[in-house]
Amino acid sequence: MKKYLYIVAMLAFFAGCTKAPEQDRAEELRNRILEGKTDKVLVVAHRGDWRYAPENSIAGIEHSIKVGVDVVELDLQLTRDSVLIIMHDATLNRTTTGKGRVSEWTLDSIKTLKLKNGAGIHTKHRVPTLEEALLAAKGKVLVNLDKADRYLDLVVPVLEKTGTTKQIIMKGGRPAESVIASYGDLLDEILYMPIVNLYKDDARQIMEGHMALLKPCAYELTYRTDDELDYPLQLREDLSGKALLWYNTLWDTLCGGHDDDLALEDPDAAYGFLIDTLGATIIQTDRAEYLLSYLRSRHLHD
């Protein structure tokens, strides 16, 4: 009896010493965004870091995770047999060894093709489905599904099947009322971020609607030139401590010329300007490793 009690006591002791499961990286990143403030800058790899691997490929996702990217941006297309795949263009021509519209090919046929790299050379990599991409990213990185609202009724079941709903970012340029009507309760699960082109006539109205109705955790902002800085500067002040600010450095007219190309010559004038002057806390880039190196040199990324 004493031996039995001893064993029970030891089992209880070791059970008490067992640590709770650690929070996965995607959950930690999600919580950081939900807080609406951070002393770091999050890095988004556009089309899954296409400079390293074919765009929208599993290899690109895996490399992004390896180097420390926080969000991978992926694009969706629908096959003839209604399967969501990861691809930017509506046609296969540019990024694969096939030709024609994605919507005219079945998944089985698309899986026979090879992805091309940035130079247009075919590789060993294949076109991934949405499900395959989400499983590669699960628990490791947040995923921005671009223009997912086109296929929302098909996307949601895949998110649920893979258990990745809470690591998904969706964005769009519609007014808050339209977003609420389309997304409904899904807004409680995903991270939704409005896209606001600050140079447009209705920009202030769109922003005010989102601030009042949705209160998003982050906003994607674009502007064309530094002659348009008044409103971006105002938003930095208005949203400080309330929401993160996402800027794109993919090309010049998204960020007033402070883009990836300028960053190769002067990263302080590009990335540094967006961070220090406009309060950028999320940057989407086509040069993820270069941006990460810059941020780490300033202790703005782990």
Please place each PLM-identified region on the residue numbering:
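Phosphate-group recognition and catalysis centered on beta-loop-alpha active-site segments
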Residues: 17-302
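Bacterial Sec-dependent N-terminal signal peptides
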Residues: 1-26
